[in-house]
């Protein structure tokens, strides 16, 4: 392992888990494990400076020596097609739900699988560390509500674009059939339908632009004492007087203005790259039509 700033990077220099940098053709560079580990440390420290020092989130709690020291532990392994994960380690308080934990991060060892090619290697590493580091901050300071993982992923996907806006890895979640734009009738709080919660990272872009840069952090401060849906409602009302219900209705409007109908001044700044929301054609055979259907909570 190597100690770099606030982080201890654990990695192998031989074998299946050996990390590697990629060359211009996106192939692994032999004997580049140390360079990869140095990149992990530099990027992780940069992410911490942005998320903690610039955005004002709490830092990462001390893990009391787990992993070989007080530094936060990042493990580099061959994860196949998985970018990374953050694992709760030891409880900090004794709350039955919503408690805080120390944690560690595991990341892929080369990001060679990432698509498009422009995001392979270091770009994939960058957004992964921005994403997973915020999970560490969430778990360590604000609390882990086990039935509300959706908002943890929404926030961490949003954080990728905040810290590294040029990468746009989150675009991959917007177009597939499981996304918010293709299945808006799935509840906002759903975390069991494919990867739809990842496509809802755009909620963070909406909240930050509509209610201010500190609005998402205020939601997390409320999560210390309430589950995410209630916490979001409380935070938005304190900031703007708007309820979650009101904000959600406006968000649905934002999601109408994407693709060829985007307006980067009024809505998403990168909305021209987003798909348009799914539409359903209805044939009228008379002057009146009655449509009966149901919607899940917080869906459109």
Predicted regions and their residues:
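Juxtacatalytic substrate-recognition/specificity segment
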Residues: 5-148, 155, 166-167
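Aromatic side chains
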Residues: 7-11, 57, 75, 134, ...
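Generic signature of intrinsically disordered, low-complexity segments enriched in small/polar residues
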Residues: 10, 14, 39, 58-60, ...
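Glutamate identity and glutamate-enriched acidic tracts
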Residues: 18, 51, 71, 77-78, ...
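Residue-identity detector for glutamine
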Residues: 25, 77-78, 138, 172, ...
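Acidic/His/Gly-enriched intrinsically disordered linker/tail segments
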Residues: 91-100, 123-127, 143-210, 214, ...
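Beta/coil-rich, acidic/histidine-enriched accessory regions frequently appended to metallopeptidases
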Residues: 225-300
């Amino acid at each position: 392992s190597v100690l770099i700033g606030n982080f201890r990077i654990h990695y192998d220099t031989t074998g299946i888990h050996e990390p590697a940098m990629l060359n211009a053709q996106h192939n692994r560079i032999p004997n580049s494990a140390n360079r990869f580990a140095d990149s992990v440390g530099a990027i992780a420290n940069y992410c911490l400076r942005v998320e903690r020092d610039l955005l004002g989130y709490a830092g990462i709690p001390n893990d009391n020596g787990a992993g070989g020291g007080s530094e936060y532990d990042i493990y580099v392994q061959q994860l196949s097609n998985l970018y990374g994960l953050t694992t709760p380690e030891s409880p900090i308080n004794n709350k039955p739900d919503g408690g805080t934990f120390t944690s560690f991060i595991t990341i892929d060892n080369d990001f060679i699988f990432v698509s498009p090619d422009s995001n392979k290697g270091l770009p994939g590493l960058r957004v992964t560390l921005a994403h997973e580091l915020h999970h560490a901050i969430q778990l360590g300071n604000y609390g882990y509500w086990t039935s509300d993982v959706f908002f943890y992923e929404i926030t961490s996907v949003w954080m990728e674009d905040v810290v590294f806006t040029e990468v746009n890895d989150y675009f991959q979640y917007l177009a597939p059939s499981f996304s918010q734009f293709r299945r808006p009738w799935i509840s906002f709080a759903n975390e069991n339908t494919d990867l739809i919660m990842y496509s809802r990272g755009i909620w963070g872009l909406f909240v930050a632009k509509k209610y201010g840069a500190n609005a998402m952090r205020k939601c997390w401060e409320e999560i210390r004492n309430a589950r995410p849906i209630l916490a979001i409602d409380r935070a938005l009302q304190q900031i703007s007087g708007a309820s979650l219900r009101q904000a959600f209705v406006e968000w649905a409007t934002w999601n109408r203005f994407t693709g060829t109908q985007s307006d980067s001044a009024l809505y998403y700044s990168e909305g021209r790259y987003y798909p348009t929301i799914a539409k359903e054609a209805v044939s009228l055979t008379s002057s009146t039509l009655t449509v009966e259907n149901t919607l899940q909570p917080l869906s459109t």
